[in-house]
Amino acid sequence: MRTILVVDDDAWVRGLARDVLAREGYRVLEASDGQDAIRVSAEHPGPLHLLLTDVMMPGMNGCDLAAGLSALLPGLKVMFMSAYDRDFLVARGLNPVGPVITKPFTIEYLTRRVQMVLGDRRAAAPVATAAPAR
């Protein structure tokens, strides 16, 4: 079973991602910010396969978190979530190294993107666009 660490300061987004990804058969760990994510990853006994993190959070941003965890956990795949597009983030000095899904997104879009990043064969059909999940 693959393990995904979901990091977002919005409890609703974390809960949605947790529920959706758990239904898809993933083990899901949660953290509310970068420091919490480092603690959770250190306490988790098994491998982490994917970091799914918000980009803009209080304290440590998702880009710095991804760089830090990737240095500690070689082979960790990273996917970012943001209410802003990549151009907006880069203009503010944030450069997510990895795919960015724009919030809000559909449940199907989140699932397919995670499957694609993890190389899961279930992700055969492409998803054209993100759309509101609320």
Give short role names for the model-derived ranges:
Residues D54, S82:
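Active-site residues of response regulator receiver
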Residues S32-D36, N61-L65:
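Acidic catalytic/metal-coordinating carboxylates
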Residues P45-L52:
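Active-site beta3 strand of CheY-like receiver
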Residues F105-L118, R122:
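C-terminal output helix
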Residues G25-S32, V40:
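Short hydrophobic/Thr-rich beta-strand motif most characteristic of the beta2 strand and flanking loop
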Residues G15-R23:
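Charged docking surfaces used in two-component/phosphorelay signaling
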Residues M57:
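Receiver (REC) domain active-site loop signature in two-component systems and cognate sites
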Residues D8:
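Conserved acidic carboxylate
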